[in-house]
């Protein structure tokens, strides 16, 4: 196999509670309650669509150590589907779902699934074309620099094919994110890794291209806060002759948060404000939108894209806001 693809996702936060506005109306609660799980379904669809050799998930599969039963069953169902299509899955746990906290209803994983332990960096070979390295968090508050535990360039002879490092960490001191497993870029580029599949930071960012150091962002936005706005999804990585040839973002979110400028200074009543908001929705091509907050000439909104369901049809998703929720 001279060329192949893999998918890099992180921070699924399955069954995230969207604390703040879930109880404002039944429709709001339903839309938000299902958003993270439907984004997971879309991730599974993407892996099958692009014929991915494997999927890496860089931490925070669940939103908290309690790991709700609904989220666990949905996650396992997605992994079973990927296993059926021959897609390997490699998972690390992060600060929201550490291995030694919470509980698990899953006693046996589907074939082809590997969950990295927390005692040391493990290596998993993928059909002779790649070696994936990873380590999970044993507890939520990990302060060690885990990047230094990965193979260094001096040991370059180790591993086969493309070397992928999966790590949940704060690289470069991102503001607004706890300094868990904090490291700097030199710690990452000094390792014998060709592609760093990072998680923890919810804003999508490519820190380096040689080697690749990538945050895909979270799978589903959770609030109108800066790092949660805009398109959310995963990265599709194309590999040719043992080297990364392309890294492409694919949006998978079911609910999207944006902040838009809407001039309502001349509006005579609330009905006119709503009319202008609807007009803005149409201009953006969104299925539906809702106002979150407003100030002089400024209106924070969230939008639902016209999303592809698991059955392949095009159908809109209702979009409603949430508060900031839990920190990442």
Label the predicted regions.
Residues 1-72:
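N-terminal active-site segment of His-dependent metallophosphoesterases
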Residues 3, 51, 192, 243, ...:
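Short loop/turn motifs at secondary-structure junctions
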Residues 33-37, 71-72, 143, 177-178, ...:
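A conditional alpha-helix N-cap/helix-loop micro-motif detector
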Residues 37, 41-48, 76, 147-151, ...:
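Amphipathic, non-transmembrane alpha-helical secondary structure
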Residues 48-49, 80-84, 282:
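Residue-level signal for alpha-helix termini/capping positions
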Residues 49-51, 156-159, 283-284:
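Glycine-rich phosphate-binding loop signature in dinucleotide/nucleotide-binding domains
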Residues 54, 65-239, 243-244:
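His/Asp/Glu-rich metal-coordinating catalytic cores
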Residues 247-328:
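Accessory, non-catalytic peripheral segments of nucleic-acid enzymes
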């Amino acid at each position: 196999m001279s060329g192949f693809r893999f998918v890099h996702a992180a921070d699924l936060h399955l069954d995230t509670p969207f604390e703040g506005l879930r109880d404002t109306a039944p429709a709001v609660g339903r839309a938000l309650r299902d958003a993270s799980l439907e984004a997971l379904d879309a991730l599974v669809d993407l892996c099958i669509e692009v014929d991915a050799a494997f999927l890496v998930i860089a931490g925070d599969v669940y939103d908290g150590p309690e790991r709700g039963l609904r989220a666990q069953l949905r996650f396992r169902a997605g992994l079973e589907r990927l296993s059926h299509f021959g897609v390997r899955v490699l998972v690390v746990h992060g600060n929201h779902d550490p291995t030694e906290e919470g509980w698990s209803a899953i006693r046996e994983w589907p074939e082809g699934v590997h969950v990295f332990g927390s005692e040391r960096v493990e290596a998993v070979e993928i059909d002779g074309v790649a070696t994936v390295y990873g380590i999970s968090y044993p507890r939520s508050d990990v302060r060690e620099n885990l990047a230094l535990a990965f193979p260094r360039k001096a040991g370059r002879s180790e591993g086969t094919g493309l070397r992928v490092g999966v790590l949940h960490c704060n690289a470069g001191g991102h503001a607004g994110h706890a300094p868990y497993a904090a490291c700097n870029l030199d710690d990452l580029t000094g390792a014998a890794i060709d592609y760093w599949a990072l998680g923890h930071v919810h804003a999508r960012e490519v820190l380096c291209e040689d080697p690749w150091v990538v945050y895909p962002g979270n799978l589903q936005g959770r609030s109108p806060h800066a790092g949660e706005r805009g398109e959310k999804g995963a990265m599709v990585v194309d590999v040719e002759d043992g080297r990364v040839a392309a890294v492409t973002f694919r949006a998978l979110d079911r609910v999207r948060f944006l902040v838009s400028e809407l001039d309502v200074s001349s509006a005579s009543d609330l009905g006119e404000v709503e009319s202008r908001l609807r007009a803005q929705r149409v201009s953006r091509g969104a299925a539906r939108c809702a106002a979150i907050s407003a100030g002089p000439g400024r209106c924070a909104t969230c939008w639902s894209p016209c999303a592809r369901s698991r059955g392949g049809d095009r159908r809109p998703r209702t979009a409603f806001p949430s508060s900031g929720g839990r920190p990442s």
